[in-house]
């Protein structure tokens, strides 16, 4: 069987027919970690390592697993040596999604059809570097060539959004680049919480002395983001919790933490519950889609974290007790307060793939006619794999309505990651095609094709409008 040809990942004739209907659709990438400054400056790349390996902790993680020295991963080794080290790793990475992503990127972006190995790495390295310069490969060119219509970046609440403003004012660039409000530091367990409160007070000109004044200052920043095109928020929680507290308790807790007190687990849960509930109230008011990523255990290798910082490939999926109880109580609390915004829930641990959409189904009711008001998000991070995508879609189809799914996102720091949308579309086509081939749904390519188009692109546009 041919590898990485036009029918790559398309396992049956029905899949091939469905894929033809969605392969050329534009991309609505509603969540990523691209830098708007890089998009605006649009510098031409001259080295594949900067574009392909720099900051890519997926690749770094594999290279460590292959015995590559840190010098050749994040250290001072030459770029050629780093490229060769990755080539040695890639040729041993069959079964890992990085292999599929990489061969798709090499072929579809740079025209490299042969497989990258240790033996041809140096020749391909120089060939791609020449291609980068000759074809003036830059962030905007990669975005345009991938037909990306919308990019949702991930942004600190105190960001002045200057680069977003410049991109909005630039008539030569058609893609919308919108900020996303990501308030990780608003939670008391964060090591920079006290500094964040001080900076928040300075940015808003407010005196923050208690929970109420803290939320008022947060609303001012949310309003600022809304004025500058923000359509979504995001947050990452280790666990989903629900622990109610009285306002006076929250005031005392905030005062103590700002004085240097280390909060206890119960207090962390109380603060997370209260702050997130207030933020959801504001997100609903300002029309933000609320994205919740949960289940990551971060920075587990302390030596690497202390040397390199966060997001360097030493994170894991986590587990937790009483997810269903906490999630149901939290969502019900939001409903009771009329504070339930449109939400996308991304679960990192696939063992909870039934729990999440099953719980969301309890709270889908809304009077605005919004289909899929609460979304079970695409397979995230370690679940961003063929099996992870299928598991997520299976769970959603069984517990809700797959046809209303808002589809794929890159959640990436790389301008080459738009190939993941094509990867997803191929897997989606095979998934739906198998239903046809096995006689589980009518062989109606108009209905199934429309469903595939909606999942690949149309649903996201409508959901974020």
From Swiss-Prot:
Keywords: Isomerase
Keyword Amino-acid biosynthesis among UniProt keywords: no
Any single biological process term in GO: D-glucuronate catabolic process
EC number of the protein: 5.3.1.12
Disulfide cross-links: none
Reaction catalysed by this enzyme: D-glucuronate = D-fructuronate; aldehydo-D-galacturonate = keto-D-tagaturonate
Pfam families: UxaC
A GO term for molecular function: glucuronate isomerase activity
Pathway per the UniProt entry: Carbohydrate metabolism; pentose and glucuronate interconversion
Family statement drawn from the similarity comment of this UniProt entry: Belongs to the metallo-dependent hydrolases superfamily. Uronate isomerase family.
Protein name: Uronate isomerase
Organism from which the protein derives: Streptococcus equi subsp. zooepidemicus (strain MGCS10565)
Top-level taxonomy: Bacteria, Bacillati, Bacillota, Bacilli, Lactobacillales
């Amino acid at each position: 069987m041919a590898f990485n040809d036009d029918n790559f990942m398309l396992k049956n004739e029905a899949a091939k027919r469905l894929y033809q209907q969605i392969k050329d659709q534009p991309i609505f990438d509603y969540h990523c970690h691209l830098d708007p400054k890089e998009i605006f400056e649009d510098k031409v790349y001259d080295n594949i390592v900067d574009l392909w390996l720099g900051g890519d902790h997926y690749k770094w993680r594999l290279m460590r697993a292959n015995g590559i020295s840190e010098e050749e991963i994040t250290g001072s080794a030459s770029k050629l040596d780093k490229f060769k080290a990755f080539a040695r790793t890639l040729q041993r990475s069959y079964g890992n999604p990085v292999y599929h992503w990489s061969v798709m990127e090499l072929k579809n972006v740079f025209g490299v059809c042969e497989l990258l190995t240790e033996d041809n790495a140096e020749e391909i390295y120089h060939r791609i570097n020449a291609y980068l310069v000759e074809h003036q490969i830059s962030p905007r060119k990669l975005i345009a060539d991938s037909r990306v219509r919308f990019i949702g970046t991930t942004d600190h609440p105190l960001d002045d959004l200057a680069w977003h403003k410049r991109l909005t004012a630039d008539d030569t660039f058609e893609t919308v680049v919108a900020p996303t409000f990501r308030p990780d530091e608003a939670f008391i367990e964060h090591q920079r919480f006290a500094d964040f409160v001080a900076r928040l007070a300075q940015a808003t000109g407010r005196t923050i002395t208690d929970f109420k004044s803290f939320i008022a200052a947060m609303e001012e920043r949310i309003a600022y983001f809304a004025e500058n095109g923000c359509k979504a928020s995001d947050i990452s929680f280790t666990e989903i919790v629900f622990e109610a507290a009285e306002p006076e308790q929250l005031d005392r807790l905030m005062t103590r933490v700002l004085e240097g007190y280390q909060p206890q687990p119960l207090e962390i849960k109380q603060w997370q519950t209260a702050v997130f509930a207030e933020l959801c109230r504001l997100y609903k008011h300002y029309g933000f889609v609320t994205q919740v990523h949960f289940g990551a255990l971060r920075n587990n290798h302390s030596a690497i974290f202390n040397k390199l910082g966060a997001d360097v490939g030493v994170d894991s999926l986590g587990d937790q007790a009483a997810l269903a109880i906490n999630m149901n109580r939290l969502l019900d609390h939001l409903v009771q307060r009329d504070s339930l915004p449109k939400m996308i829930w991304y679960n990192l641990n696939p063992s909870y793939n039934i729990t999440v959409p099953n719980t969301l189904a309890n709270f889908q009711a809304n009077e605005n006619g919004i289909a899929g008001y609460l979304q079970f998000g695409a397979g995230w991070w370690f679940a961003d794999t063929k099996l992870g995508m299928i598991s997520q879609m299976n769970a959603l189809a069984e517990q809700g309505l797959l046809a209303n799914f808002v589809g794929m996102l890159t959640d990436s720091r790389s301008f080459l990651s738009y190939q993941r949308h094509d990867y997803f579309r191929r897997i989606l086509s095979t998934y739906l095609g198998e239903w046809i081939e096995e006689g589980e749904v009518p062989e109606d390519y108009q209905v199934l094709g429309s469903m595939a188009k909606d999942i690949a692109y149309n649903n996201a546009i409508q959901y974020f409008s």
